């Protein structure tokens, strides 16, 4: 007579393991872009355009911050202009009083 040892039964998984993924997260939006429109009146120190790199160049009465943000140096009217054939710039022209 053959004796079976039933205490040595092994149960294998009937479903695959869940695994993991390296995705599933996203960075916060940086709120880049134009902060003042063409023709809008701004005061000195106002932020005109937030950017990474020089997508738009500073023109008349416009400064560039350390993070490439463009800001008005004087109070005036904002104008987005072409600079040459393929570049853009933003200028602020003082209001004549």
Curated annotation (Swiss-Prot):
Residues 1-12 form a propeptide. The keyword Ribonucleoprotein applies. Signal peptide: none annotated. InterPro entries: Ribosomal_bL27 (IPR001684), Ribosomal_bL27_CS (IPR018261). The N-terminus is cleaved by ribosomal processing cysteine protease Prp. Gene3D superfamilies: 2.40.50.100. GO terms for biological process: translation. Pfam families: Ribosomal_L27. This is Large ribosomal subunit protein bL27.
């Amino acid at each position: 007579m053959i004796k079976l040892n039933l205490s040595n039964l092994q149960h294998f998984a009937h479903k695959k393991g869940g695994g993991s993924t390296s995705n599933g997260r996203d960075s916060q939006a940086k709120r880049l872009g134009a902060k003042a429109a063409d023709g809008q009146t701004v005061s000195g120190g106002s932020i005109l355009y937030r950017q990474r790199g020089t997508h738009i160049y500073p023109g008349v009465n416009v400064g560039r911050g350390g993070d490439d943000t463009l800001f008005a140096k004087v109070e005036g009217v904002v104008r987005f202009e072409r600079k040459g054939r393929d570049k853009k710039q933003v200028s602020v022209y003082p209001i004549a009083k």
